[in-house]
Amino acid sequence: MDDSIDEEVISGGSTITVEFSGGAETLFGGVKEHIVPLDGSKIVLLEEMLRWLRDHLLTGDAGLFLQENTVRPGILVMINDTDWDLMGETEYILQPGDHILFISTLHGG
């Protein structure tokens, strides 16, 4: 899978909710919740959505959110209130109406 995302992959159709908490929202312009369009006629993996978030919504340092093709350690990911480890992580197939929550556990001080 290449690093470029096809604009048609995540466009039109249904939506998913993406939420950031624990400071992760600062990487996305301070906005905690985003409604992301999802083309319900195509299979879209969470990995593709991560690239889409990086390319379209991320305003901070990408290295603080992503490491290679996944979320960096220290950021918990919940898919519909379930740990993404139980859902297939980046291979999870997004469904219309999904709620994806990113919680940063990294705190400065």
UniProtKB/Swiss-Prot annotation:
Predominant location category:
cytoplasm
**Could you tell me where this protein is found in the cell?**
Cytoplasm
**An example Gene Ontology cellular component term from the record?**
nucleus
According to its UniProt entry, the protein's GO biological process terms are: protein urmylation; tRNA thio-modification; tRNA wobble uridine modification
Supply the alphabetized keyword list. Answer: Cytoplasm, Isopeptide bond, tRNA processing, Ubl conjugation pathway
Q: Please report the PTM annotation for this entry.
A: C-terminal thiocarboxylation occurs in 2 steps, it is first acyl-adenylated (-COAMP) via the hesA/moeB/thiF part of the MOCS3 homolog, then thiocarboxylated (-COSH) via the rhodanese domain of the MOCS3 homolog.
Q: In which pathway does it act?
A: tRNA modification; 5-methoxycarbonylmethyl-2-thiouridine-tRNA biosynthesis
Q: Which residues carry this modification: 1-thioglycine?
A: G109
Where are the membrane-spanning stretches?
Answer: none
Organism domain of life = Eukaryota
Task: Tell me the residues linked by Glycyl lysine isopeptide (Gly-Lys) (interchain with K-? in acceptor proteins).
Answer: G109
- Single Gene Ontology MF annotation: protein tag activity
Name the CDD domains for this protein. Ubl_Urm1
Tell me the protein family, please: Belongs to the URM1 family.
| HAMAP family given in the database record | Urm1 (MF_03048)
- Biological role: Acts as a sulfur carrier required for 2-thiolation of mcm(5)S(2)U at tRNA wobble positions of cytosolic tRNA(Lys), tRNA(Glu) and tRNA(Gln). Serves as sulfur donor in tRNA 2-thiolation reaction by being thiocarboxylated (-COSH) at its C-terminus by MOCS3. The sulfur is then transferred to tRNA to form 2-thiolation of mcm(5)S(2)U. Also acts as a ubiquitin-like protein (UBL) that is covalently conjugated via an isopeptide bond to lysine residues of target proteins.
Which PANTHER family does the record associate with it?
RURM1 PROTEIN
Name the chain's protein.
Ubiquitin-related modifier 1 homolog
Lineage, highest ranks first: Eukaryota, Metazoa, Ecdysozoa, Arthropoda, Hexapoda
